[in-house]
A protein has these predicted regions:
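The beta1-alpha1 cofactor-binding region of Rossmann-like NAD(H)/NADP(H)-dependent oxidoreductases
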Residues: 1-12, 43
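Active-site loop of short-chain dehydrogenase/reductase
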Residues: 22-23, 37, 68-81, 114-117
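Conserved NAD(P)H cofactor-binding loop of Rossmann-fold oxidoreductase domains
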Residues: 29-35
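Substrate-binding pocket helix/loop in short-chain dehydrogenase/reductase
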Residues: 37-38, 45-50
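A short, exposed helix-loop element centered on a Lys and neighboring polar residues
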Residues: 61-62, 106
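Catalytic loop of short-chain dehydrogenase/reductase
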Residues: 75-100, 106, 110-113
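C-terminal helical subdomain
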Residues: 114-130, 134-171
């Protein structure tokens, strides 16, 4: 699904409703990275990349919350990056999208936590090892199964200790 298409996101959730019912957990993971100096940027590509992390995330959050609120429970998690909290040279577009994503998650946490919807943001700070990578030296890359376990752990947190943000890094 192209998360920048509101219609495609709505259709995805309608199809999931038919097959799975109301979700307990929704994870927004899409990202678009565009590197380059500010004067070299293709603004059409920049706009699309920013929309993935902002409009896409907002659209997915709206559809997820609309389904979870009547039940009074659920978790909506967003995958950020180091660029969610600090900018890097030649990565301004990525930073705009990830800062926006983090701001959305922070706002939704304040809005939806009182309604028993757990909102979480994950700062994934490092390279991710492919699932079949047997050459991953200790502390060099994040292991994808362990990232998944971190998401599941946050989802299972007791409401009295809900985290809204967790940083994941291999060292």
């Amino acid at each position: 699904c192209d998360v920048t298409s509101i219609q495609q996101v709505e259709n995805l959730f309608k199809k999931a409703d038919e097959i799975l019912g109301t979700p307990d957990l929704v994870i927004f993971n899409p990202s678009a990275r565009l590197r380059g100096t500010v004067e070299e940027l293709d603004m059409r590509a920049a706009k699309k990349a920013i929309e993935v992390s902002t409009i896409g995330a907002l659209s997915v959050a709206k559809e997820a919350a609309t389904r979870m609120l009547p039940r009074g429970s659920g978790s909506i998690f967003f995958t950020g990056a180091s660029a969610s909290v600090k900018g890097f040279a030649n990565s301004s577009v990525f930073a705009v999208g990830k800062f926006g994503l983090r701001g959305l998650a922070q706002s939704l946490a304040r809005e939806l936590h009182p309604k028993n919807i757990h909102i979480g943001h994950f700062v994934v700070d490092g390279q991710i090892s492919p699932p079949l990578d047997t050459n991953n030296e200790l502390d060099s890359k994040l292991i994808s199964d362990e990232i998944a376990n971190a998401y599941l752990h946050m989802h299972r947190q007791h409401r009295s200790v809900w985290s809204w943000e967790i940083e994941l890094r291999p060292w």
